């Protein structure tokens, strides 16, 4: 995809309620990441989206809550490292390589030990167009343990305007009932 410009971010501001251009920029980056992930043939057969970004950007659009990450669940039968390599391959043209932090690695190792599910986390640090010298973090997390969903994965249309075109994807995800149930469960945990 083409690098973002200040004009792209200002144009995207018309479609989101965020008061700060930095948030608008990060929202546009998330949109581009979602489209890239779910327009990839391999990943489309392996991952589904869940979490607040799916809930607010697709089910409850226009979004009323700001999102900073993409939560995925791996439902396909390919090994975790194949999925991780594919995510890196697909997002590299957009964000470069994910950043490595010893503290993030330690936190994730503790999290994966304490909780019954295992998570793969990739954090991308992207130079901001709106605030030169600053960076935006895009976090992609994939649960690699919960491979058999309680309810069926559904293809949900997702699209956003970018320059003179509309970028679209069929995002694998869960219906609104499953999403609200998941959020309610998280509140009680």
What are these language model-derived features?
Residues 1-189:
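Compositionally biased terminal segments of proteins
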């Amino acid at each position: 995809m083409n690098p973002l410009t200040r004009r792209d971010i200002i144009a995207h501001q018309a479609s989101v309620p965020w008061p700060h251009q930095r948030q608008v920029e990060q929202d546009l980056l998330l949109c581009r990441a979602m489209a890239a992930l779910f327009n990839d043939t391999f990943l489309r057969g392996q991952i589904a989206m869940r979490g607040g970004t799916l809930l607010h950007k697709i089910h409850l659009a226009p979004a009323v809550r700001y999102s900073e990450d993409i939560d995925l669940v791996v439902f396909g039968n390919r090994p975790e490292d194949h999925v991780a390599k594919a995510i890196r391959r697909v997002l590299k043209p957009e964000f470069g390589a994910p950043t490595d932090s010893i503290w993030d690695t330690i936190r994730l190792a503790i999290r994966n030990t304490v909780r019954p599910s295992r998570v793969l986390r990739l954090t991308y640090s992207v130079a901001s167009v709106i605030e030169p010298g600053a960076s935006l973090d895009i976090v992609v997390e994939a649960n690699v343990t919960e491979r058999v969903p309680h309810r069926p994965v559904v293809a949900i249309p997702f699209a956003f305007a970018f320059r003179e075109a509309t970028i679209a994807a069929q995002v694998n995800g869960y219906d609104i009932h499953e999403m609200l149930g998941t959020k309610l469960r998280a509140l009680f945990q």
